Amino acid sequence: VILLSAAQSRELDRLSQTSYGIDSYRLMTRAGEAVASAVVQRWPEALAAGALVVAGKGNNGGDGFVAARKLREDGAPVSVLLLARTADLKGDAALAYADYVAAGGGIIEAADESSLANQHPGVVIDAIFGTGLNAEIRGSIHGVIEALNRFEVPIVAIDIASGVNADSGAVMGVAVRAALTVTFGYAKYGHVSYPGAGFCGALEVADIGFAAEAIDKISPHGRLIERAEAARLISPRSTNTHKGTYGHVLGVAGSRGKGGAALLVGRGALRAGTGLVTVAIPECVATIVAAGQPELMTEPIADHNGHFASEATIARLTDLIPGMNVVVAGPGIGTSDDTRKVLEWLIREGAAPDRPLLIDADGLNVLAPADPALFKAARGPIVLTPHPGEMARLLSSTTAAVNANRMGAAQRLAEMTDAHVLLKGARSVIVTSASAVRINSSGNPGMATAGMGDVLGGIVGSLMGQGIEPGDALTLGVYVHGHTADRLAARVGSFGYLAGDLAAELPAAFTEIVG
């Protein structure tokens, strides 16, 4: 599913008009009519109490006037509050207002929060701000949006919930909590990336007649990862193969009390189809790991206070790594000084053009804050997979700031490090370059449990080891991880399934995705 930025959306609109002769007011009319149609289809009974359209002075407000006119034509009671003067309306918005008034509609202009006091609609239509909003909402409109959110009726947002940044999903001070958003042509990043996704409600993408050829000129790089996208990345297996065909993954994981992390990395890699998996582990957890999964090969390494001893670890990895297709490092390794030395060495020496290095969990924490020079010195692809807390430490930020603009945080880390970045969480964000952003659609709250990230690291490492390039391995791995969890939740509910359960379910999930 294609995702557009606000600028790309404007360019699609402009090209449709200037290069392909599509009338701008016709586009506005179709947009407003699509909104009215969605309201009638979803809330016909609520419309008996009337629709309240709250409009701004721009084209989003113009769409609102069209929707109001269409609903009146369909027999619904309609009220319109304009958060500006009618003299402020320009262009197509002014034309839409004139057509609405000509059809017998009335408005309250220069409306504010107090104007809502006597309104008792069955449905509210948010036509305040569109996808162009890029500044904090303050003043009277802030109060209007807060008041709208107190209405106990469905709110339908036109194009995007007012207050949500279309490029990042960030909330610009305050945002309308919509039950439904009707957008036009293509979804935008802010519709599907949290926190904005939580304000937009259900998403309906209406075809209003943009020129199909225009999208090719825009060349959008954003994608919402759904099943078809994941299935495209799974190649059929030849009958004439052997275990070496499907790669050799090296996991560098575990410490005293966290041997399970190494096990889960290994299980994720094995269940995602890797031919061979070796886990390098501190000697203190070697027995536990070896007994936990007989298909894993183990490389016990001398430890220091329960963690990898740096000199012994680097010496052993120097011998091991040349025979590997990919390295997954970090889960459960702790944050000692020895660990830091191992991770820095891996970045400088472990990655190669044909051998990606994935760093997760403690491997990220011990490297925080991120040193751009260190990462940019790597000789091969680096993949970083932080959750919001780890991202905050890498960026010298806060978890709250990361969650307020998840896309921005992922893009910033990718730019700093030249790495492929996955920011985990609801609607995980993948950044493979400055312009290529992918957002995952699968997964559920049951995944908020220990070890899920370790399994994911194993899955993505497995896919890279099988020859899938890092960006696509992240795309497929994250989707499969979430889809597998969705299978479990459908069967047992979203409480209490474990990371190990997810690993065991992976083969069936891959088979289902391929169909």
PLM ranges: what are they?
Residues 80, 91, 109, 113, ...:
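Short amphipathic alpha-helical segment within the helicase RecA-like ATPase core
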Residues 107-119, 317:
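Short acidic low-complexity segments
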Residues 116-118, 174-175, 319-320, 413:
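Structural alpha-helical scaffold elements that stabilize or flank donor/cofactor-binding regions
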Residues 1-84, 90, 94, 180, ...:
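Small-residue (G/A/S/T)-rich helix-start motifs and N-terminal tracts that mark the onset
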